[in-house]
Amino acid sequence: MDRTETRFRKRGQITGKITTSRQPHPQNEQSPQRSTSGYPLQEVVDDEMLGPSAPGVDPSPPCRSLGWKRKREWSDESEEEPEKELAPEPEETWVVEMLCGLKMKLKQQRVSSILPEHHKDFNSQLAPGVDPSPPHRSFCWKRKMEWWDESEESLEEEPRKVLAPEPEEIWVAEMLCGLKMKLKRRRVSLVLPEHHEAFNRLLEDPVIKRFLAWDKDLRVSDKYLLAMVIAYFSRAGFPSWQYQRIHFFLALYLANDMEEDDEDSKQNIFHFLYRKNRSRIPLLRKRWFQLGHSMNPRARKNRSRIPLLRKRRFQLYRSTNPRARKNRSRIPLLRKHRFQLYRSMNSRARKNRSQIVLFQKRRFHFFCSMSCRAWVSPEELEEIQAYDPEHWVWARDRAHLS
C-alpha cells in the first residue's frame, strides 16, 4: 500500500505528523504484536489532535505502545519541574509600624507564603480526635502581637521618665466625680524632726516659760501661732542647735503679723524679751517699719527719692515760715545738745541700744533666710501638729476657752 503523509498546521506551528507504512489489520489493532510480514508497526500520535486517515481505515485511536507511555510520563515530569521552579518566592514589603504625629515610621516585613491550602493539607494529616478547624491566629501572629505590645509599653515608659514630677510639689487625688477626677497640687512639707527637737528645747527656756504662762487668753501664743514658729524654723534652714530664745520671739512676732492685727498684744513680747527696760521699744518699732519697706520692691525703688522729698519739704517749710532762715543757724546747736543727751545716758542704756540694733539686724537676716515666705497653709499646720499630737502645746486652743 502506498505510503501516505499528512501534515497539519495550527496557529502557525506543526501540531502532528502521521506516517503509516501499511494499512493496519483488524487483528493487529487488538494486540500490540508484530505483523506477519515481519515489519514493525510505527506510529507517532499527537496528544492534542489526530489527522484524518485514508478511506477504509478504522478511525479509533490505535493502541499506544510502551515507549509512548514512557515518553508521556517523562513529558509530565518535565512539565511539573518548571512549575516548582516558577513558584513565587516570598516578597518583601514595607508596612506602617506606628504613627508619631505627622511622621510615619515604616518597617520592612516579609510576606508569608503560607496559604489556606497548606492549612487544609495539614488538618487532613492530623490524627482523629483533633479539631481540624483552621486556627484564627497563627503562632507567628501571636508572637508579632506580643512584640507589638512590648514595643508600645516601652514607648509609653520613656516619656514618663522624662515627665517625672519634682520632689517639692506633688499632685494628689482630692475627690472623684463620676468619670472625672479632680487633682490638687500640694507642696511637700519641709519640716524635719530636728526642727521639732529645737522647738521643744526652746520651750524649756525660763523666759519662754514665763511668757507662755502669762498668755492665758492665748492672744499671742495659741497652737496655730506656735506651729508657725516650727514652720519658720524649717524655712530658715539654720542648724537645730543654732536656734536660740531670740529666734523664738522673732518667729512668734512674725506669725502674729501674718495672722493677728492686735498691736497691743505684740508689745508684750518686747516686755518679756527686754524685761522692764522699755527704752528700746520705740527703736524696735522704727526698725520694724524699715524692715517692712525693705521687703516691698516698690519701696526699694522709691528709696532714691527720699533725699529729694526731704529737700522739697525743707523748701516748703522755708516758704511758709519766714523765721526758718534765722533758725537754720541753730541746727548745729541742736545736734550738739542731742549728742550731749546721748552721752548723759548710762552705759546700760547705750549697751541696750546696741543690742536692739543687733536684734533688728538678726531679724532681717532671719526673714531673708526664709526667702520672704511667711505664709503657712492650714494643711502644713495640721501636719506639724500631727507629728506629736499628745504634746501639751497643742492643747492651747482658743476654742476651749469659750
Curated annotation (Swiss-Prot):
Single Gene Ontology MF annotation: protein kinase binding
Polar residues: bias regions: 16-39
Biased composition (Acidic residues): 76-89
Disordered, as annotated region: 1-89
Protein family membership: Belongs to the Speedy/Ringo family.
Protein name: Speedy protein E6
Protein's organism: Homo sapiens
Lineage, highest ranks first: Eukaryota, Metazoa, Chordata, Craniata, Vertebrata
Gene that encodes it: SPDYE6
